[in-house]
């Protein structure tokens, strides 16, 4: 029985992985945490006590293909202070879109990371 999503992984070359690590820590607010000693270089980023984002270098440190057809549209994080998130995005010149879904009383912010995810 599936209980939910455990984590997601972004894979790219070492330079982009470093850029993504910095973005998800400084902008999104995830924390760097423990990661098993895999052969590939990478990081596990945590929300509270849970690893939610894995970053890993691709085989032979080659940047993954861009513009590959995919059905993945977005990944969603929950946050406790929308105003602070918006201020951080604005301060760092990160374009975002707001959306409110009144039927379920949800406010959303959509933005892209440096790799375009």
Predicted regions and their residues:
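Short acidic/glycine-enriched loop/turn segments that link adjacent beta-strands
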Residues: 37-42, 71, 103-107
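Vicinal oxygen chelate
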Residues: 1-3, 87-117
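Short secondary-structure junctions
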Residues: 29-36, 94-99
């Amino acid at each position: 029985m599936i209980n939910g999503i455990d984590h997601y992984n972004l894979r790219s070359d070492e330079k982009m992985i470093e850029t993504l690590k910095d973005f998800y820590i400084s902008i999104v607010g995830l924390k760097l945490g423990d990661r098993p000693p895999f052969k590939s270089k990478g990081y596990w980023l945590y929300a509270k006590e849970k690893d939610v984002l894995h970053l890993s270098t691709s085989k032979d440190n080659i940047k993954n293909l861009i513009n590959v057809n995919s059905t993945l549209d977005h990944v969603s994080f929950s946050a406790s202070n929308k105003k602070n998130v918006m201020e951080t995005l604005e301060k760092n010149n990160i374009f975002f879109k707001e959306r409110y879904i009144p039927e379920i009383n949800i406010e959303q912010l959509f933005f892209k990371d440096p790799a375009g995810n």
